[in-house]
């Protein structure tokens, strides 16, 4: 009752303060409406209403005024539609000159991602908006109740009944204020329809009521039903893929803003009890996919320089986030002496949450969520890291596989992307056996079809080795061997050459240039320079290009010069050096040097224990 009154007050205050203007027709789709069309549209509308009031005469001054005002309105509308690109370019230039960075980059992103997408009327045999929504509801109901958790639930409550309860956590007004301030604006609201801005600008009185409400929830390990409701929105993974395939969608959970505030407060409390494993590079500050890939490549290079083969296994999980058994996570939290009031609150919260699917303008019936972590939730990254910690720990302490300076470098993970490293076939098979046992314990399922293995030795690649050693298997299914694999966006090859990844970036650069030229060819030079620095100087994985053929790098530099000249409207036979000097832009060599220098500084000063060990023990590295 108390919670419902708080939310109803926020909703009523929002409706009274924020005006809701209904958009009619295609008004919001016309670029330049406010500057060129709106005034003439109002005049034409008033003239039309006056003409109707006069009885719709076919002659006279009233008819002429209506006719001419409508003609002026239609002419302005045609002008905006015919000059849409120029008007968009002028709007970008105006926001750039006014130093309105948020509006400028919002316009750039909108124009860059503009793509005609047809409405999907059929998915997995379901036709029609309502039938598709019901299909999604049945699909997610089955997915989020696919793990048997009864035994783990009983074990958790038995453990919770036998521990000594600590003092309950008190939520202060400062905690609520800091949690609300940390939330991002312009995010989609939850089921109650309240936006983040309503909480940020409500003031001290609302924060006081929320602190009391959150304290009551923690003391009694209870939250209202409306507090736990979530909306599930299926989003497309690959827009160029099959839009009628269920597996081409991922579920994003939208919860209430007040729920996110409590998640922020709980996250700040539980993180003080646990430090994440250094083998996990995901969901951690100052860690990135580039750092994880660099650690993998350095470990392989450490063994390759000593003439040893390295077996690499890239593990792919099937619905890892959606099949998390959260009762095991709560049991781990109790074992780590996390405040029992927080753990019991999370247990009640996750075991009673209700979800509904939103598809276009249709909402499905609610269903109970029995397993899985919410993709998009604030607590979800922390809970998944705790869940997969057991797997990483057992592999790292097994003393099997690659080691550097006495520390295990046999497993690296970025979220659910796990890679195993071993210098021998027996070692890799033992690591796979340990991983399979941990997956059974954690109710995780390996996708053998997408799991790949690769044998690496850039010094002496012996083809007979691949023919003589047996294949690896998971649950009786053979794992395919490959010579190239795209791990975290970077292509790793059996010869540890980066030519394939450079070729990938060349293709991406050509495609990106064609898109930008089409979208922004009528923009001013200042706008083009800003867009160039954002889209042409941030190459993913460029700091990991350590070994490559000279001809491949020359192709990359030629592609870079060609794209610069095309984007800024120069002739293809113009001198690239003169273009760079005139526009004061960095050359390809400068971009490469800057990226390598920044990553080298990050590598040398990083606090991760594995990165520090590789840096200190293994001196002759490409980053030295």
What do these predicted ranges mean?
Residues 7, 11, 207, 244-278, ...:
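Conserved pre-motif C helix in the palm subdomain of viral-like polymerases
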Residues 9-12, 99-246, 253, 257-261, ...:
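Surface-exposed loop/turn segments and immediately adjacent short secondary-structure elements
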